[in-house]
Design a protein with these regions (language model features):
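Glycine-rich phosphate/diphosphate-binding loop of Rossmann-like nucleotide-binding domains
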Residues: 74, 81-99, 157, 165-262
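Rossmann-like adenosine-cofactor binding region
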Residues: 232-302, 307-309
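General beta-strand structural signal in soluble alpha/beta enzymes
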Residues: 105, 131-134, 155-158, 189, ...
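N-terminal ligand-binding/catalytic initiation module
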Residues: 1-153, 375, 381
């Protein structure tokens, strides 16, 4: 049985990966009178007087919504809300298993920006946070920014920021392995969608200043055509040298490659043209931009991918459960840039210097320390 066949079989057996489990048990008339009418009126009256009391008396304190419109699901593309459900259920499982956070999958049958924003605002009272998932760019940028302005609970687009945080964590440790310095490193980010933009922003915030973004058309610059509004903002702060040309041109003399793009688009010749001891994070799934063995043969020192069957998996599951755990426990109203930086540094710190090597720059999601270390990093900044 192939993995694909096994996955389909298990999903059929599970018939959904989630269920509701009651914390209050109704076995007697007294139980019923306390959990429901008439007793339930008491917390209702308290909350009506003080909305903050909902965190004390309801599931709001440890429950988030995982919201998607199904427009950019994994490598499957715009498959719609129903087909996106297995992914959102899976995401909810990861929140619970790794962070102890309750998560409810909500797949919306609209891809209209205004309708999505209005719907999330209207359902927000039931939740302590909103995790946006698999919403296509550039709509995802506006949806997140508007919701952050409108709501007093944390809103987090994991495809952007979870990915960026783990990439930065990996790069922090890869710099130690290679002896490179962020101030002088030349970085190429290939893929100018949600993840690529967020990665670039966080690397800039951390202190990288020589970053070039590329997409299918090549190097992005101020004179590039057909840029969306977010990409136009990004070319104002990247490619300061005014480079033009292809991905190969961008990689010539670069120190770090971060790929969130397409399979097999980086060649050995491109890697060989990079600076000595290059760092490559080739995260296209399931087939990376270049296979690790080929990158190593061409001279790369540290190679990470999105896959669990290669060393240095760059997996945002080490970030998002702990981020929301900390945000909920600390009653954060926003997840700030400072929190993202602190989270990346915390994840990087899980691999001590004496254990760092070219094949060990990131801790695994199954490391029991991860969620607590990440959540503490978030709470310290609330």
């Amino acid at each position: 049985m192939t993995n694909q066949e096994k996955a389909l079989k298990m999903h059929e057996e599970w018939n959904g990966k989630l269920e509701t489990i009651a914390k209050s048990h109704v076995k007697t008339r007294e139980d019923l009178a306390i959990a429901y009418t008439p007793g339930v009126a008491e917390p209702c009256k308290v909350i009506a007087e003080d909305k903050e009391a909902a965190y004390k008396y309801t599931i709001k304190s440890n429950t988030i919504a995982v919201v998607s419109d199904g427009s950019a699901v994994l490598g499957l593309g715009n498959i719609g809300p129903l087909a996106a459900m297995p992914v959102m259920e899976g995401k909810a499982v990861l929140f619970k298993e790794f962070g102890g956070v309750n998560a409810v999958p909500i797949c919306l049958d609209t891809q209209d920006t205004e309708e999505i924003i209005k719907t999330v605002v209207n359902i927000a009272p039931a939740f302590g946070g909103i995790n946006l998932e698999d919403i296509s760019a550039p709509r995802c940028f506006e949806i997140e920014e508007r919701l952050k302005e409108l709501l007093d609970i944390p809103v987090f687009h994991d495809d952007q920021h979870g990915t960026a945080i783990v990439v930065l964590a990996g790069i922090i440790n890869a710099l130690k392995v290679t002896g490179k310095d962020k101030e002088t490193c030349k970085v190429v980010v290939n893929g100018a969608g949600s993840a690529g933009v967020a990665i670039t922003k966080l690397l800039l915030t951390y202190g990288f200043s020589h970053i070039t973004m590329c997409d299918i058309s090549g190097i992005l610059g101020k004179d590039s055509q057909n840029l969306n509004w977010m990409q136009k903002k990004m070319v104002e702060v990247t490619n300061l040298e005014g480079k033009k040309g292809t991905l190969a041109d961008a990689l010539n003399g670069a120190d770090i490659f971060v790929g969130v793009s397409a399979p097999n688009i980086v060649t050995k010749e491109m890697v060989a043209s990079m600076n000595k001891d290059a760092i490559l994070f080739a995260m296209a799934n399931p087939v990376p931009e270049i296979m690790p063995d080929l990158a190593k043969e061409a001279g790369a020192k540290v190679v990470g991918t999105g896959r669990s069957d290669f060393p240095n998996q760059v997996n945002n599951v080490v970030a998002f459960p702990g981020i929301f755990k900390g945000a909920l426990e600390g009653r954060a109203t926003k997840i700030t840039e400072e929190m993202k930086l602190a989270t990346a540094k915390a994840i990087a710190s899980l691999v001590p210097d004496e254990e760092l090597n070219e094949n060990n720059i990131l801790s695994e999601a199954f490391d029991p320390r991860v969620a607590d270390v990440v959540s503490e990093a978030v709470k310290e900044l609330i």
